[in-house]
Curated annotation (Swiss-Prot):
<comment type="similarity">
    <text>Belongs to the FAM83 family.</text>
</comment>
<keyword id="KW-0597">Phosphoprotein</keyword>
<feature type="modified residue" description="Phosphoserine">
    <location>
        <position position="926"/>
    </location>
</feature>
<feature type="modified residue" description="Phosphoserine">
    <location>
        <position position="806"/>
    </location>
</feature>
<comment type="subunit">
    <text>Directly interacts (via DUF1669) with casein kinase isoforms CSNK1A1, CSNK1A1L, CSNK1D and CSNK1E. Interaction with CSNK1A1 recruits CSNK1A1 to keratin filaments. Interacts with KRT18 and probably other keratins.</text>
</comment>
<feature type="modified residue" description="Phosphothreonine">
    <location>
        <position position="749"/>
    </location>
</feature>
<feature type="modified residue" description="Phosphoserine">
    <location>
        <position position="1041"/>
    </location>
</feature>
<dbReference type="InterPro" id="IPR050944">
    <property type="entry name" value="FAM83"/>
</dbReference>
<keyword id="KW-0963">Cytoplasm</keyword>
<feature type="modified residue" description="Phosphoserine">
    <location>
        <position position="882"/>
    </location>
</feature>
<feature type="modified residue" description="Phosphoserine">
    <location>
        <position position="871"/>
    </location>
</feature>
<feature type="region of interest" description="Disordered">
    <location>
        <begin position="735"/>
        <end position="760"/>
    </location>
</feature>
<feature type="modified residue" description="Phosphoserine">
    <location>
        <position position="970"/>
    </location>
</feature>
<dbReference type="Pfam" id="PF07894">
    <property type="entry name" value="SACK1"/>
</dbReference>
<feature type="region of interest" description="Disordered">
    <location>
        <begin position="829"/>
        <end position="1056"/>
    </location>
</feature>
<dbReference type="GO" id="GO:0031214">
    <property type="term" value="P:biomineral tissue development"/>
</dbReference>
<feature type="region of interest" description="Disordered">
    <location>
        <begin position="512"/>
        <end position="545"/>
    </location>
</feature>
Length: 1209
């Protein structure tokens, strides 16, 4: 009995009523074999011998003869001598297909899911149409125009240009269009596109493939295929038009045809049929000539575009590169070089090199791995990321269609196989839809594509998406730039560069820059963050999506910071950055590029200007990485930073990171101005990071080191002898002294840059074990000269304006001491405003000199200040030394602030921040209440700064706290004489505006113009305080050991930290600053203004003043400040009592501010309130609990108070 496989009628009952006898006849097969082997003659002979009728018409005979294909493996055919009926492999191609595991192409543009229908409806259309019925062509056009999800066309012949226009319009609307053409007639379609100058390769939402009829295999292995005679148009999987109508002009005009329009459940059968046909389809193959011309053209869609512009023949006209002349079909204007531009994806050309080209849809069998394949792939081998040999577009898309990849497609490691039937596909689609919900509402789940990625791309698994991605999901997600279906097509190459195997995939957890900094800090020394932000932002919801941007390395702040040093290293760059910062501060600009409102960020930038190494939020001093040492020598690199970093090494870096982390986490980071943020928060951060105790300890340690290695210089300053100690001490000295001189040398802004370079060199020299002594001597001599000139100027000032002169001295000292501490941005401003003082006007020099004595103990200050005088660089360079030279110097230098900063970047930095107010003012003895207020109330720092005409200067100093500006401002203010004038002149632009603004605020705050006099008087008074400071500085430098100076600075640092904390905890606004200034002004007013004048007037301003000396003119607070300056440790003790700690100081400040605000409800009572605040400042600790509440209230009253002041004025 015949086996089932041998009997087509097995199981059929011949006796059944509906039995249909088989029609198969053996002679049919034998006759066809004879035809294929011997031609028509053999065919006729066989029929004659069998006595059978001719069952083939002439057309069929011609078709078979014309399309007969030899066996695929010709080499295996038997030699001519062997019998033709013997198969070399012993099997027939009919039963043993060569490519049984051929991959199934996917519907890469998406396919809508349909689960139910609203009913079934069938409409019959005929051609030519009846009078009242639409024609088949019109109905087809209407259907295509209404498409929203998909247009699927199966046609034997497609040469109607009108219908082609409709299809292209749909594709231009981003409606996926699939066209399946008869393989044998596809050339006609290509010819039509060529005539219309339509480049099918650049219509993203169009897929044209070919389908052949069933293949008939002969016993010899020869075969021939039939035509695709199915004709239907499927729209949105909801409506189908099917019939005998072909998309040809003749069918509209001369042929009779029939078509039906189906809606409802019947559409599902066409849906399934189309999927089956598409799975069996092959890429569209152009003519041999066109293919040859396109070998080098695939990635160069048209002349002048794409990476292969230079490839020979690219510019030659081809069927797919049309001349630039008016379009035949669509008159509307279009883009040059592309036919039907209105139908193209708008961003298609921008990344055409990564687009899937129509050539990719050409049959892999035809192209195979020969000529056309490699030329196309070569251009992409060097992708932007060099990950893969070109975008996945060509190889990955094509390899499914190449014989080399067609085997074993079902034997995937995970056992997953391509979907074999429509039912299974539908089931998977349903499951996917249910699991993903709306994401796949308009998209067929491309489970095939997903599995194919796994199956066929196992060779590069990184390209396998976690879940299918389709056009509609992409579009619905609204991801501009990725809406191109080619990006999702399995066979289509991404228009965008592919991710390399070395690039992390999106599936991996990519920590944000913030989290990275939290874990590792933002120090550039740790290298760039693993991935950038930020351009990509949060990870895409579709983890499976592999867009190059997702894994693109980000140019993080850290990475940029490494380049920053050299880019902005120059003084000009720093000055520019400072100016910009000042401008932003004035304009109320607050968002920093990356770290929104982070105070340290702004400061880091400022410092960065000086020392690019520290790009992060941390001050450059903290951020000084290993790179800094190398860059240290460079003026732009920030010698101070380099030295500090060299000395401190990675330890410092780690500290810097911690500091950055703290500041980043700072909840109060968001401020109204970048400047204010940097000032307040830098000081706050410093205070937070390093406690006053830590600062004091560091200062003491530094002092000890200084004592050990220090020698007295000509100026009386302690000069370090030991190399390492010298380096640290010198740096510290430079920082402290440099700052002091910097404060005086308002010219530091511009010249300070140059000076910074010089001072950096000096510092480096000093750092060098051998040259330190010599450099110190020269610096000392310079300092002495400066001091002398300063004393002379002081005398002159005293004679002209006794109070002003004194004030000037104190202010100069303050300025000199605080310049370096000013934030770099203010340094520039300060330099502009003070340059006249420091450079142009002798008084500034005097100031610088006066301060120099103080700074001399540091040792570095001498060179710094002289440099400043001689060359703008020295004082500033120290700052320059590191983006925050002052910081680095602090670190490197024994000065408590700096060392502390090193020891605890936070303290050091806070010190720096607070120092402008507490530390620096005290040290500086700035006439401005900055000093006194520092002691009395950190608040005064701000008032001073405000009061000072050159508020930017303090900022410039690098210390976020305005106190530095206060000193400068005080200096300029108190010495409204020539100094003030030059300062104002110099501080043009932002600086001028700031200075004027602060003055105006003071005036507003002070109901009487008497306020100004008061301020001037106050300045002298602060000078008294400052003067004692100044003398103490000199005495510290000369009489007192460097230790004293260091301790003094440490205490100042404490004050600064406290002030910073206070300022930080209190959400200071401009109004708050005004209040602080008012408080400081009152404090100054009530302190003995006269005394400071004489002290400063006398050339001996440098001599230390005792608490008793200060007592007469100064309040206890002021005395404390003075004593603090004069007695290093004793001063610290006083400070501790006055400001038991940063917390105490902060509490005091907050208390004063709160009381001020409460009392400021009525402007007329403002002075009284200020007095009360001053009086209550000593007991600030008692009101700590109320500070928060008061602080919260400040915001409410300050605006009103300010408004009142303005209206009254």
């Amino acid at each position: 009995m015949a086996r089932r496989s041998q009997s087509s009628s097995q199981g059929d009952n011949p006796l059944a009523p509906g039995y249909l006898p088989p029609h198969y006849k053996e002679y049919y097969r034998l006759a066809v074999d004879a035809l294929t082997e011997g031609g028509p003659e053999a065919y006729n002979r066989f029929l004659a011998s069998e006595g059978a009728p001719d069952f083939l018409c002439p057309e069929e005979l011609e078709h078979v003869s014309r399309h007969l294909q030899p066996p695929q493996y010709v080499a295996r055919e038997p030699p001519e001598g062997t019998p033709s009926d013997v198969d070399m492999d012993g099997s027939s191609g009919t039963y043993w297909p060569v490519n049984s595991d051929q991959a199934v192409p996917e519907l890469d543009l998406g396919w809508p899911l349909t689960f139910g229908f609203q009913g079934t409806e069938v409409t019959t259309l005929v051609q030519p149409p009846p009078p009242d019925s639409p024609s088949i062509k019109d109905e087809a056009r209407r259907m295509i125009r209404s498409a929203q999800q998909v247009v699927a066309v199966v046609m034997d012949m497609f040469t109607d240009v009108d219908l082609l226009s409709e299809v292209l319009e749909a594709a231009a609307r981003r409606v996926p269009v699939y066209i399946l053409l008869d393989e044998m007639n596809a050339q006609h379609f290509l010819d039509m596109a060529d005539k219309c100058r339509v480049n099918l390769h650049h219509v993203d939402f169009l897929r044209v493939r070919t389908v052949a009829g069933p293949t008939y295999y002969c016993r010899t292995g020869k075969s021939f295929k039939g035509h695709l005679k199915e004709k239907f148009l499927l729209v949105d999987c909801a409506v189908v038009m099917s019939g005998s109508y072909s998309f040809m002009w003749s069918f509209e005009k001369i042929h009779r045809s029939l078509a039906h329009v189906f809606q409802g459940e019947l559409v599902s059968s066409f849906d399934e049929e189309f999927r089956i046909l598409f799975a069996q389809s092959e890429p569209l193959v152009p003519s041999a000539g066109a293919l040859a011309r396109m070998d080098a053209y695939a990635l160069a869609p048209y002349s002048g575009a794409g990476p292969l512009v230079g490839v020979p023949g690219v510019g030659a006209p081809t069927p797919f590169s049309f001349p630039k002349r008016a379009h035949l079909l669509f008159p509307p204007p279009r883009e040059e070089g592309l036919g039907f531009p209105s139908f193209l994806d708008p961003d298609r050309h921008f990344l055409s090199a990564f687009r899937r080209e129509e050539l990719q849809r050409m049959p892999g069998g035809a192209l195979e791995p020969h000529t056309g394949l490699r030329p196309l792939a070569r251009p992409t081998e060097a992708g932007p990321f060099g990950e893969l040999a070109g975008p996945r577009g060509f190889f990955q898309s094509r390899h499914l269609e190449m014989d080399a990849f067609k085997r074993h497609s079902y034997a995937t490691p995970d056992g997953a196989g391509a979907v074999e039937n429509f039912a299974a596909a539908r089931q998977v689609s349903r499951q996917t839809f249910l699991s993903h919900g709306d994401d796949f509402r308009f998209q067929t789940s491309h489970f095939q594509r997903d599995q194919l990625y796994q199956q066929h791309y196992q060779w590069d698994p990184q390209f396998a998406p976690a879940r299918p991605q389709g056009l509609f999901e992409k579009l619905r997600a609204g991801r501009p730039g990725f809406a191109d279906p080619d990006d999702f097509a399995l066979g289509a190459g991404h228009r965008f560069p592919e991710l390399g195997a070395d690039v992390h995939q999106r599936l991996e957890y990519v920590p944000s820059s913030a989290s990275r900094e939290v874990r590792h800090g933002s120090d550039p020394a740790f290298g760039p963050s693993p991935r950038g932000l930020e351009p990509s932002g949060a990870s895409r919801p579709n983890l499976g999506q592999r867009f190059p941007c997702q894994a693109t390395l980000r140019q993080g702040l850290d990475t940029a910071s490494e380049a920053e040093p050299e880019r902005r290293g120059g003084p000009e760059g720093r000055a520019g950055l400072r100016h910009w910062r000042l401008a932003s501060y004035l304009s109320g600009c607050h968002g920093d590029g990356g770290e929104e409102g982070l105070p340290m960020e702004a400061e880091a930038c400022e410092d960065e200007v000086l020392a690019p190494g520290g790009r992060d939020l941390l001050p450059s001093a903290f951020r000084t990485p290993a790179a800094f040492p190398a860059k240290g020598p460079k003026p732009g690199s920030g010698s101070g930073g380099g030295d500090s970093s060299e000395r401190e090494g990675p330890e410092e870096t780690s500290l810097a990171k911690q500091d950055s982390f703290r500041s980043r986490l700072n909840p109060l980071i968001q401020r109204s101005s970048r400047l204010r943020s940097s000032l307040i928060f830098a000081s706050q951060a410093e205070g937070a990071v390093g406690t006053a105790a830590a600062t004091t300890e560091k200062v003491q340690l530094m002092h000890k080191e200084q004592t050990v290695s220090e020698t007295l210089g000509p100026s009386g300053e302690a000069v370090r002898s030991s190399a390492s100690a010298k380096v640290a001490e010198l740096l510290e000295k430079y920082k402290g002294p440099a700052r002091d001189p910097g404060g005086a040398g308002g010219a530091v802004t511009s010249s300070s840059h140059s000076k910074a370079v010089v001072s950096q060199a000096w510092r480096e020299e000093v750092v060098a074990p051998g040259g330190a002594g010599t450099e110190r001597r020269s610096l000392e001599s310079c300092l002495l000269d400066l001091r002398d000139s300063f004393a002379q100027q002081l005398h002159q000032e005293a004679e002209r304006h006794p109070g002003a002169a004194s004030l000037t001295a104190a202010q100069l000292l303050d300025t000199l001491g605080g310049t370096d501490r000013l934030p770099s941005r203010f340094l520039s401003a300060q330099g502009r405003s003070l340059s006249p003082q420091g450079r142009d006007s002798p008084p500034p020099e005097g100031l610088g000199t006066h301060q120099l004595p103080y700074s001399e103990p540091k040792g570095n200050p001498t060179p710094a200040y002289p440099e400043r005088k001689g060359s703008p660089t020295p004082a500033y360079p120290e700052r320059k030394g590191s983006p925050t030279p002052a910081y680095p110097e602090r670190k490197g230098s024994p000065t408590p602030a700096y060392p502390e900063r090193k020891g605890s970047p936070t303290q050091a930095y806070p010190e720096r921040k607070g120092s402008p107010t507490s530390g620096f003012p005290n040290r500086r003895g700035s006439p401005t209440t900055g000093l006194m207020e520092q002691k009395g109330s950190p608040t005064s720092t701000y008032p001073d700064r405000r009061g000072s005409p050159v508020p930017p200067v303090p900022e410039r100093r690098g210390s976020p706290v305005p106190p530095v500006p206060e000193r400068r401002g005080s200096l300029t203010f108190a010495g409204e004489s020539s100094k003030t004038g030059p300062t104002e002149e110099v501080s043009s632009g932002p600086m001028e505006v700031l200075r004027k603004g602060s003055l105006r605020l003071r005036q507003l705050l002070s109901p009487k113009n008497e306020r100004r006099g008061e301020d001037e008087g106050s300045f002298p008074t602060p000078q008294e305080n400052g003067q004692p400071e100044s003398p103490r500085r000199p005495s510290l430098s000369r009489g007192d050991s460097t230790e004293a100076a260091a301790e003094e600075r440490g205490s100042r640092v404490r004050l600064a930290s406290a002030t910073a904390n206070a300022l930080y905890s209190s959400n200071l606004r401009d109004d708050t600053k005004a209040i602080l200034e008012q408080i400081s002004a009152h404090g100054q007013k009530h302190r003995g203004v006269p005394a400071p004048g004489p002290a400063h007037s006398s050339p001996d301003v440098g001599r230390p003043t005792t608490a008793g000396d200060l007592a007469p003119d100064m309040s206890d607070k002021d005395k404390c400040s003075a004593i603090f300056r004069s007695d290093s440790l004793g001063t610290q003790g006083r400070l501790s009592r006055t400001l038991p700690g940063s917390a105490e100081e902060r509490d005091r400040l907050l208390r004063r501010m709160e009381s001020m605000r409460k009392e400021k409800r009525v402007y007329s009572r403002f002075e009284v309130f200020c007095k009360k605040d001053e009086a209550g400042s000593s007991g600030a600790g008692d009101n700590l609990a109320d500070e928060d509440t008061r602080d919260s209230k400040m915001g409410k009253f300050v605006p009103k108070i300010l408004g009142t002041f303005k209206s009254k004025k």
